[in-house]
Amino acid sequence: SASLVGSEMCIRDSLTIKEYDSRRNRYLLDFPNNEVKKGFLTMVAANYFKPQEFEVSNWIVDAVILLEEGETTAFCSALTSFLADIPYDSHGSIKTVEATEKHFQYTFYLILRLLGVYCLLHVEKTQSRGRVDCVLETKDYVYIFEFKLDGTAAEALQQIEDKEYATPYQTDTRKVTAIGVSFSSETMTVEEWEEKTL
């Protein structure tokens, strides 16, 4: 599409070299601004997910609005629909449990990075009692996510409580919500979703 070509040109012309490691001949690239970052991530997502019915960038904006408004049930439905729209042949090379888990990690890392263009995002945030899968912060809400592959949403929610992932937000004036999400390796989408206001 024209917007994708425009994003590609913008990215090619705007990525900057942040560091160079001469021993390993490796470059660390960075984005000069959020617009270039958004264009790059949207282009990668469109290629990786190959959604059939909607544009990735539109879905991301809609998802962020739902999170900004505290509409977690609608966000869960949107996430489930998005994952269900990824063509089955995108998952074709997945043969083992480990590969399935890696596939979900990559998929959600990319989705979360896209959301992070619009709100504050912490992926695999290390805390004193463990590493929380994801914390998304908006102006009025803090969402603490724990993901389980072929587990239960209740187990994910219990981990948030047991590891006290919400402790850093005890004095935060925003509404803090713990969300446990279970994904199915069979359906490749959301299986269960449980949340609790903390």
Identify the residue ranges that each predicted region occupies.
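Domain-level recognition of nuclease-like catalytic cores that cleave nucleotide substrates
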Residues: 168, 172-198
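Conserved catalytic cores of phosphodiester-cleaving nucleases, focusing on short active-site segments
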Residues: 108, 132-149, 163
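Leucine-rich, amphipathic alpha-helical/linker segments
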Residues: 33-89
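A short, conserved structural fragment
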Residues: 11-20
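Active-site metal-binding core of divalent-cation-utilizing nuclease and nuclease-like domains
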Residues: 115-139
